[in-house]
């Protein structure tokens, strides 16, 4: 059995607080029931999944998509997110539950905090230094790609401030 969580659910991830939490990915086949848990640093269970849905596929050898649901959680962390069945376990470390902000747009959303060589942002260096005081701030950048079909995952990871 092999679980693969979507890249958004990697080490250092931030999950939205006070809202139902959904975790998804794919698996080859499942031995028993899929169970997911959120554990604190002392391995105490903070939350256990309340529902798991498996996609029905015609080809029995094709990977199946799964969706795991947790009840809303308060802000906190760092946690470990474990997804397992009777045969294997996948663990994601340094997971926080907090505020998730999504910024999207066109080329203007790619401008770095410091600006560009001939278009600097006033006070940027001070803001960048200040961000280092808050290691819980995370950033997940979805790389640009062109595709004729919907893309379900991307090859990237969470970064600390």
Model-predicted segments: where are they?
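Cell-envelope and extracellular/periplasmic
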Residues: 1-161
């Amino acid at each position: 059995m092999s679980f693969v969580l979507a890249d958004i659910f990697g080490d250092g991830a931030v999950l939205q607080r006070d809202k139902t939490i959904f975790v998804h990915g794919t698996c080859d086949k499942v031995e028993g029931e899929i169970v997911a848990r959120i554990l604190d640093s002392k391995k105490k269970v903070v939350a256990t999944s309340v529902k798991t849905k498996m996609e029905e596929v015609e080809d029995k050898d094709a990977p199946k998509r799964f969706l795991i649901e947790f009840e809303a959680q308060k802000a906190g962390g760092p946690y470990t997110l474990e997804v397992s069945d009777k045969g294997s376990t996948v663990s994601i470390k340094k997971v926080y539950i907090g505020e998730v902000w999504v910024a999207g747009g066109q080329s203007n959303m790619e401008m770095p905090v410091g600006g560009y060589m001939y278009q600097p942002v006033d006070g940027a260096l001070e803001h960048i230094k200040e961000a280092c005081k808050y290691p819980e701030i995370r950033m997940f950048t979805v790389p640009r790609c062109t595709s004729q079909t919907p893309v379900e995952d991307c090859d990237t990871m969470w970064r600390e401030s």
